[in-house]
Amino acid sequence: MAKSPRRVAGRRLLLPLLCLFFQGATAILFAIFVRYDQQTDAALWHGGNHSNADNEFYFRYPSFQDVHAMVFVGFGFLMVFLQRYGYSSLGFTFLLGAFALQWATLVQGFLHSFHGGHIHVGMESLINADFCAGAVLISFGAVLGKTGPAQLLLMALLEVALFGLNEFVLLCLLGVRDAGGSMTIHTFGAYFGLVLSRVLYRPHLEKSQHRQGSVYHSDLFAMIGTIFLWIFWPSFNSALTSRGDGQPRTALNTYYSLTASTLSTFALSALVGKDGRLDMVHVQNAALAGGVVVGTASEMMLTPFGALAAGCLAGAISTLGYKFFTPILESKLKIQDTCGVHNLHGMPGVLGALLGALMTGLTTHEAYGDGLQSVFPLIAEGQRSATSQAIYQLFGLSVTLLFASAGGVLGGLLLKLPFLDAPPDSQCYEDQMCWEVPGEHGYEAQEALRVEEPDTEA
């Protein structure tokens, strides 16, 4: 595996310079703008008339722990299925997540909690930043193995900014309801990544085809990610919902939807599989589609039956997408979707947005009673009818797709800059490009025996 001195020198400097520059810049911005909010500032908290039990920390922190584990353990392990890319899948998840959390705190803070010349942060800030990091990691899944760490950091820089802007437009300007992020997280992250992958299309990626598959143990590790995500998804969707009835209803709807998507995934996987055998790719991914599809509607009066029906449909669509639609994406649309984010996050996210609009249009005062204020405040206050709110929900989906597509194009053009050291076509999906790998010299000897055409740079 020959490495030119220029490439080695560039890699040695580029990633450290970007990491140190971004960390230094965010640290300066934190020093200037970021302050504790009323519930975490010692003087402000003790100056108020309340007990320690009233602090939001004790209500939000359990959900934050679950969401945090999903972002770093769930997403990270879900992407280790590639046989020679486990270090990068986990390591770059760690890197992107850490940077995205800091940058999202600033972007979301300026848009949502900036007053008195400062950004005020608390538990909700941490959860919102994790949501943003989740969207970045969804996009990472679409370009997994085909991008270097410097490219990924720049992708995160752009995506976090656009995520924050899209979220602000939907939630604050349009008054859209999206508790579990079917639109703001899953749809945005998926289509940002898919358009990015299209712009970065590699016509000679078959040179790395022998590394694109999984092996027995890599699929087992990926199932760890699946189980983590499956267990904690009710916390993900309910993390920022209201106290009282809102949070438990959101958790229940997500819980039942996940169970249904799992059963439909097993059923469809066996039905379309060779000789009726299950495909681990389907189980690892499509079983989670139930959590995505109820994201928007999870806090609404979906009913347990509605949650089961939505999850069953999402699991089926996701499984069929992996079997039939992913090959079409690559062959016809030239979108190389490494992790199949279109099947797990894209289509279920859009379906979830449509489900949310449907449930919004069916909203009645009788069904929600006094709880209407916490779920649909604009309807409760008489500013909108249920039908008009449903139209706003659909418009929010359109805005999200627009932001994601435009961002993906811009990001793709940015990541094509030649100095960013993209891996060559023959070395995609390979940890040795960036990591010290145990036993790599023996592996290099085997690789040297392969007859390959000259590399084509991205």
From Swiss-Prot:
Recorded topology in the membrane: Multi-pass membrane protein
Main location: membrane
GO CC list: basolateral plasma membrane; spectrin-associated cytoskeleton
Domain of life, source organism: Eukaryota
TM segment ranges: 14-34, 62-82, 87-107, 125-145, 150-170, 179-201, 220-240, 252-272, 283-303, 305-325, 347-367, 394-414
Side Cytoplasmic, residues: 1-13, 83-86, 146-149, 202-219, 273-282, 326-346, 415-458
Keywords tagged on the record: Ammonia transport, Cell membrane, Glycoprotein, Membrane, Transmembrane, Transmembrane helix, Transport
Subcellular localization: Cell membrane; Basolateral cell membrane
Stretches assigned to the Extracellular side: 35-61, 108-124, 171-178, 241-251, 304, 368-393
UniProt GO molecular function: ammonium channel activity; ankyrin binding; carbon dioxide transmembrane transporter activity
Residues that carry a glycan: 49
Transmembrane helix keyword on record: yes
Region (Interaction with ANK3): 416-424
Post-translational modifications reported in the UniProt record: N-glycosylated.
GO BP terms in the entry: ammonium homeostasis; ammonium transmembrane transport; transepithelial ammonium transport
Pfam families, alphabetized: Ammonium_transp (PF00909)
Family: Belongs to the ammonium transporter (TC 2.A.49) family. Rh subfamily.
Task of the protein: Ammonium transporter involved in the maintenance of acid-base homeostasis. Transports ammonium and its related derivative methylammonium across the basolateral plasma membrane of epithelial cells likely contributing to renal transepithelial ammonia transport and ammonia metabolism. May transport either NH4(+) or NH3 ammonia species predominantly mediating an electrogenic NH4(+) transport. May act as a CO2 channel providing for renal acid secretion.
The name this protein goes by in its record: Ammonium transporter Rh type B
Species name: Oryctolagus cuniculus (Rabbit)
Taxonomic path: Eukaryota, Metazoa, Chordata, Craniata, Vertebrata
